[in-house]
Amino acid sequence: MTRHTLSVLVENKSGVLARVSALFSRRAFNIESLAVGPTENPDLSRMTIVVDAESAPLEQVTKQLNKLIEVIKIVELDGGAAVQRELLLVKVRAPLADRTTVLQTAELFRARVVDVNTDTVTLEATGTPDKLQALLAVLAPLGIKEMAQSGTVALGRGPRSMSGAGTLRPVDRTA
């Protein structure tokens, strides 16, 4: 199976996420990563969906997705043609004897220290899924107490955009 990243532009309405995820579920696809958020247009949301699947069955799902009235556009983003990032928060055991190692590891991976107490250090890291997996592998021997990781968010490289808009405007979140 191959890892596929789909960027799906949808109407920002209730129930759309349920309908999209139901299509994947009916075809027995496991969604490895899912991130949904607003776009530069307050009427639209972007879903970034990562699945491990063969190309032919995935093509069937994307055809069915295109039939949903709330789906505006679907683009498959391949690794080199897209910028992909995830967010990781990880709480690591860090007694005084190991604290320097934890802090040096954070610096090496450009992670930020967001909380420190007598027994643990909490780090925030952003990067590619591979980078975050490497960070976790280095921290594992020290003892990971807990972690939370976001889904992948991705944009295609270059000047083109899914919405076709030449200039993006920020969403007003004060309303």
Task: Give residue spans per PLM region.
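Long, contiguous binding/interaction regions
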Residues: 1-46, 50-175
